[in-house]
């Protein structure tokens, strides 16, 4: 198991997931729809398919759209 922190813009979650889980798995585990956020780690944007292999803290940026 690994610890994943998801923080930013009103979110502050800390969860445990199996090693090899994806960014999308982490978002799903806390009920955040992947299309509503951009996820980054150390100022690098991560695709939702990124595999997580150890404890990590992820920064969330809310995506807004409209006209």
Label the predicted regions.
Residues 1-66:
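Ubiquitin-like/PB1-type beta-grasp interaction modules and other compact soluble beta-rich domains
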């Amino acid at each position: 198991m690994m610890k994943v922190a998801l923080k930013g813009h009103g979110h502050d979650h800390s969860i445990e997931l199996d090693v090899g889980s994806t960014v999308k798995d982490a978002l799903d585990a806390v009920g955040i729809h992947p299309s509503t956020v951009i996820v980054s780690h150390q100022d690098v944007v991560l695709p939702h398919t990124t595999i997580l292999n150890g404890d990590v803290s992820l920064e969330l940026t809310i995506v807004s759209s409209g006209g």
